[in-house]
């Protein structure tokens, strides 16, 4: 039996390597930018910071990323990394390759430089790290323990204390177990939600300050789910609304003004397997998406949750991340275990296709990023550079990429997400 499994693993590895070679050969035609960087340790989390600096007389801009480490028994860190991204007029040259560093893709005379600027000691791996929108120096992290940690990275030395001691600015209590979901309220400064394997969602207000030492207790604990809560997200336009998704296959919508924390305002059986992630559309107040172990992304309208608006099908395995583009109302991306990051365009739903095109996927599947050879752990849309995405995978690889303009500029469609709201699937 073991030898059969080994044989299957070898075959799969060979297929993955073959696919990667084909992908790499085609990058000049598919991308305007590709930077591949091998991190010292895999990161389970990635998020662009909102700041960008354009050094005078240079053909690149400086961007920053929040990363974490997932080491094998060595000291873990919360990391802020600096990235050089070329200006539009700098020439991208996909043939530039540095196989020693595991890097390729450059532009002009500048290699895509990525360097760790700040490393802060962390207790165990960083399951997820997210900055506070009102003050991006403040970063919350999910740990392998039940605590959620908060760091102001300006108050920590750039190089970590060799003792390995983790010294967060706040320690948020309320959970019994670890988890992944984490969401700051973009309308109420300091209000943080966290999802946990203990079946609950906790809410903290870090402005309330610690009661003793650095400990802040949860302001509310929401107990509606009957299984591991995988993800949680604040609504982007309503300060009191949030959504949560769980292994009980449910999507729940909560209102913090409600008198009860045990029953959501709305709940729906969202998928036929665990629901792993959700994302509210930044432009349309009623639209959200969920991703699931059933290999689909579902589109929802808050005004009628009984009816699923649309199901996006193309992934071959569990979906763990779904994020709307910050720049385009109809653009959504998803990723997960199948090593693929799919970019979807809602405005193309229902378009006619040739039989040949239909074999590649539905009309709304705009792009498949095939550069990863391991499960994708997280990805983030760059808030300053439209169509630039950073994705990280379990094999230490981080990729910063932008699909070729002719792919998304095909013909600009005028359908908005709000026009799709009335159409059920």
UniProtKB/Swiss-Prot annotation:
One of the GO BP terms on file: negative regulation of transforming growth factor beta receptor signaling pathway
Location of N6-acetyllysine modifications: 4, 119, 159
Glycyl lysine isopeptide (Lys-Gly) (interchain with G-Cter in ubiquitin) cross-link, chain position(s): 4
Expression (tissue specificity): Higher levels in brain, thymus, lung, spleen, kidney, testis, and ovary/uterus; lower levels in heart, liver, and muscle.
GO molecular function, one term: histone binding
One GO cellular component term: NuRD complex
Keyword Secreted: no
Matching Pfam families: CAF1C_H4-bd, WD40
Subcellular location, record wording: Nucleus
SUPFAM superfamilies: WD40 repeat-like
Database matches in InterPro entries: G-protein_beta_WD-40_rep, Histone-bd_RBBP4-like_N, WD40/YVTN_repeat-like_dom_sf, WD40_repeat_CS, WD40_repeat_dom_sf, WD40_rpt, WD_repeat_RBAP46/RBAP48/MSI1
Modified residues (Phosphothreonine): 10
Family to which this protein belongs: Belongs to the WD repeat RBAP46/RBAP48/MSI1 family.
Reported function: Core histone-binding subunit that may target chromatin remodeling factors, histone acetyltransferases and histone deacetylases to their histone substrates in a manner that is regulated by nucleosomal DNA. Component of several complexes which regulate chromatin metabolism.
Subunit-level organization: Binds directly to helix 1 of the histone fold of histone H4, a region that is not accessible when H4 is in chromatin. Subunit of the type B histone acetyltransferase (HAT) complex, composed of RBBP7 and HAT1. Subunit of the core histone deacetylase (HDAC) complex, which is composed of HDAC1, HDAC2, RBBP4 and RBBP7. The core HDAC complex associates with SIN3A, ARID4B/SAP180, SAP18, SAP30, SAP130, SUDS3/SAP45 and possibly ARID4A/RBP1 and ING1 to form the SIN3 HDAC complex.
Name of the protein this chain belongs to: Histone-binding protein RBBP7
Taxonomic classification: Eukaryota, Metazoa, Chordata, Craniata, Vertebrata
């Amino acid at each position: 039996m073991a030898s059969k499994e080994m044989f299957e693993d070898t075959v799969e590895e060979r297929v993955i390597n073959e696919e990667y070679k084909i992908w790499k050969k085609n990058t000049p035609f598919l991308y305007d930018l590709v930077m591949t960087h091998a991190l010292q340790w895999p990161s389970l989390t990635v998020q662009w910071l909102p700041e960008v600096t354009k050094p005078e007389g240079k053909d690149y801009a400086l961007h920053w990323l929040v990363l974490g480490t997932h080491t094998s028994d060595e000291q873990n860190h919360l990391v802020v990394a600096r990235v050089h991204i070329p200006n539009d007029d700098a020439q991208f040259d996909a043939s530039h390759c540095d196989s020693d560093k595991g890097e390729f893709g450059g532009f002009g005379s500048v290699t895509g430089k990525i360097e760790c600027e700040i490393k802060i000691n962390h207790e165990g791996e960083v399951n997820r790290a997210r900055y506070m929108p009102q003050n991006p120096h403040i970063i919350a992290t999910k740990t392998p323990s039940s605590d959620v940690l908060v760091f102001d990275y300006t108050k920590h030395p750039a190089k970590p204390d060799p003792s390995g001691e983790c010294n967060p600015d706040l320690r948020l209590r309320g959970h019994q177990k670890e988890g992944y979901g984490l969401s700051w309220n973009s309308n109420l400064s300091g209000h943080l939600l966290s999802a946990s394997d203990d079946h609950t969602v906790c809410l903290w207000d870090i402005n309330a300050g610690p009661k003793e030492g650095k400990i802040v207790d949860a302001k509310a604990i929401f107990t509606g789910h009957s299984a591991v809560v995988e993800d949680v997200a604040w609504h982007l336009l309503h300060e009191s609304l949030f959504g949560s998704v769980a292994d009980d296959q449910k999507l729940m919508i909560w209102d913090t003004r409600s008198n009860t924390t045990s029953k959501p305002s709305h709940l729906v059986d969202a998928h036929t397997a665990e629901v792993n992630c959700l994302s509210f559309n930044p432009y349309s107040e009623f639209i959200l998406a969920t991703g699931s172990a059933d290999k689909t992304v579902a589109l929802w309208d808050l005004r009628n949750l009984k009816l699923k608006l649309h199901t996006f099908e193309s992934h071959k395995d569990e979906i763990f991340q779904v994020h709307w583009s910050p720049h385009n109302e109809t653009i959504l991306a998803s990723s997960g275990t199948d090593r693929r990051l799919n970019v979807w365009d809602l405005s193309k739903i229902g378009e006619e296709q040739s039989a040949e095109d239909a074999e590649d996927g539905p009309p709304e599947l705009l792009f498949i990023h095939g550069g990863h050879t391991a499960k994708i752990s997280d990805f983030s849309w760059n808030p300053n550079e439209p169509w630039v995405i950073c994705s990280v995978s379990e094999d230490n690889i981080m990729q910063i990429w932008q699909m070729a303009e002719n792919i998304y500029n095909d013909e600009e469609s005028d359908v908005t997400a709000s026009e799709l709201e009335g159409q059920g699937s």
